[in-house]
Amino acid sequence: AFTDHYIRLVEGFGKQAVIWGALTHAKGDTPVKSENIIMNAWYNGYADPATMIKDGYQLISIPDAMVYIVPLAGYYQDYLNEVFLYKEWTPAHIGKAVFEEKHPAILGGMFAIWNDHAGNGISVKDIHHRVFPALQTLAVKTWTGKETSLPFEVYNEKRSAISEAPGVNQLGRIGKSPALVYERSTVAPGSTSTYPEIGYNYTVSFDITGAPEKSGTELFRSPNAVFYLADPIRGMMGFARDGYLNTFPYKVNPGEKATIQIEGDHRSTTLRVNGKVVEEMNIQKCYFNAGKDSMSYIRTLVFPLEKAGNFNSRIENLKVHNYRVSK
């Protein structure tokens, strides 16, 4: 009764109803309208696709085990298996049910990202890092099905040269091959940069001569993140983004001279001082409910470069590489 009621309510506003498949699992006694109704076929145990097609529904192929992303959850996928999807999957594959290619009742395919674990440190940038390559691959497969024109390895190489969209660079890519992509001999307080940020993978290094700094003193900021010389709470080196503050067990003392290096990728952020690792902020396992439950916590950073803060320390020899130099 619930599903049929809301289908008709939606249609009453002149809209086409789209529902998530559940009518095998929760069939009920009330007949449910199927004419001109689109159903997301996500789990065959909840909605058997052959039965749903027979009943008159139009399907969108979105099989959970194949195309669901749940970041750092430990179930479903953290990143889609694009090699498998490119080589083996088409919208005609709904879980273990396989239909004829271009079946008239299957409108196409989709993927989904579900952020089930609030508080796990995943940033908007991390979500985009998962979504964009999946979007590219699903676009190929929903347009071409089995008739892909390139081997995956060639496709994977060629797509790296394509921008996300005109004027869009959410991944923070600088340069197309591993290189030193930006440098400055000195960084003056309040100065601006050619680039707003650099995304994974990267290495940012600089020489510092320490001076007294107030808590909250920024080295760089962008619209998406802040890197602190002295964080607002403990005065340590660290960074903030998406409502999370992560700090390293290190601060520059007045008069101290040091070479600082920060490396970042899609799983970690590492601080080195004078060539020695201070901390590699990789994925943590956090426990709660008296230790009965746990959740992964990630501490990634798309490094901000847009504007320097109002610091007192001297910053020299800034170098930005678009790869991790230690790897």
Residue ranges and their predicted role:
Residues 204-206, 256-273:
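Short tryptophan-centered beta-strand motifs in secreted/extracellular beta-sheet-rich domains
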Residues 237-259:
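Short, aromatic/His-centered strand-loop micro-motif at the edge of beta-sheets
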Residues 63-70, 81-159:
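Substrate-binding cleft of secreted/luminal carbohydrate-active enzymes
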Residues 278-316:
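Flexible glycan-contacting loops in extracellular carbohydrate-active proteins
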Residues 179-238, 315, 320-325:
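Extracellular glycan-recognition modules
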Residues 1-38, 42-56:
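Active-site neighborhood of glycoside hydrolase catalytic domains
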Residues 7-16, 22-23, 121, 133-200, ...:
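Carbohydrate-binding surfaces of carbohydrate-active enzymes
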Residues 191-195, 246-252, 290:
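Beta-strand-rich interaction surfaces with strong enrichment in secreted/lumenal proteins
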